[in-house]
Amino acid sequence: MSDRPWEKLAEDTAEKRWEAQQRQEDLVPGSTTPGIGAPLATVDGGGKSADQRRLRALALGPTLALLVDTLGRQIIADGVTRTADQQGDLAALWAPWERAGMPTRQTALWKAALTDGEAFLLVAPNGPTAKLEAASVARVGVDWGDDPTADWPARAVFLTKGGRPTLYVTSQDLIRIDRSGSPYEAVRHGLGYAPVCRFAPYLSIDGDAESLVDRLRIPARRYIKTVHDRLLIQHSNSWRVKTVTGLDDPGSLEDAERMKAHLSTSSILTGGDGVQFGSLPETSMQSVLDAERADLGTLAALASVPSWSLSGSQLVNLSADALAEAKSAERAHITSIQRALGRPLLNALRASAQIEHRVSDANDYTLRVDWRDTEARSLSQAADALGKLSQSLGVPAQLLWQRIPGVSPAEAQEWQEYADAHPSELEAYARALTADGEGTPPIEES
């Protein structure tokens, strides 16, 4: 093996870095080096005239970025719970996520995973605690060894934006690399695996991480082409053209220009025998507008999001059941993404617990992620539904607190602790009854 194995691993990421830059240009055209985003930009055959360049720039828009935002903003991890009765401090388990600022940075992590097909989270020792560092696919080179579907890679290298290696991760050590490419510090983590978690929402059974942008590039190109055609009509053929036939030859170029100027500015036109005036109608845009809506609807359907989330159209006279049905595909899509992202997130927390010598937490596979409910429901609707669950089905009200929109599991736990510390008079009396040990109140002696 080479004395500098990270160099070969970094070289192998060059194509991935270029692809990531191309996806960024597809998300927000014009945000990176001109010419990178050729697949979406050449909607008119790559014309060079000023008018063509201007119309091309107007046609390109951040439609894919809006789509990724629509999905990414609805994926919020609020905490973890256990599905079995095990001992352990959930606050300590969740603390590395909080220390890394991930409650506010997680949306960027999920959006990077959706855009590039995968994003990464490094779990590293930081004194007595664990530290989490997120990185996009453009800044990480990974070797999966013989199993591309494994939870942990065989080794990994972290890069600068320019592609220079800065950190080499093995199953035992974190090796820091200076600007000359030489190692200068090694930190032993001793986990037995390279602590780099991969968040891949569309990971195939063979380990291929598909990108949402790559999946939707063709329908997005179709939509942009339709928008470009509409702009061409608006720019060139959206007004009536006046015509005149039978005019005498003016005789000179100056007279011809003078007559042309007169005809173009006069509101009342007159002519001699045989002169006929008319007009050519403007090109109708109805068909291209219908095509634009159809292309946007196709793009939304392929992304499993409601079409109105991309078009901004208003919803009129939709019942609650119809609205829920319209959003069912999006909800199923987000649920599948949450399932895919939940396992690597829990792996990161278990690795953090192992670094912090919390053996019980590190071996706890009963954990599950609490994902925030981001459905657009009013508080009155939620209260009515939860009240019916409690009264009609006998579900304890305290267990429904965390299902209230906007209430996190941590807040629900605080409510439970407060309720335990401040019982109602009836609950206090019931506790006094059971304090005797026989279920009867104590007898006062006279």
How should these model regions be labeled?
Residues H235, V241, K327-L346, S352, ...:
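Long, compositionally biased
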Residues E185-E325:
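Extended, charged amphipathic alpha-helical segments
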Residues L109-W110, A124, Q234-K242, S309-Q314, ...:
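Short coil/turn segments at secondary-structure boundaries
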Residues M1-L132, P441-S446:
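Extended, helix-rich architectural segments
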Residues R105-A113, L121-L122, S284-S380, K388-S390:
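C-terminal amphipathic alpha-helical
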Residues G37-D44, N126-T129, L247-A261, A348-Q381:
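Charge-rich, acidic-biased intrinsically disordered regions
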Residues T115, F120-E210:
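Extended, regular secondary-structure scaffolds
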Residues L386-S446:
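Activation/maturation switch segments at domain boundaries
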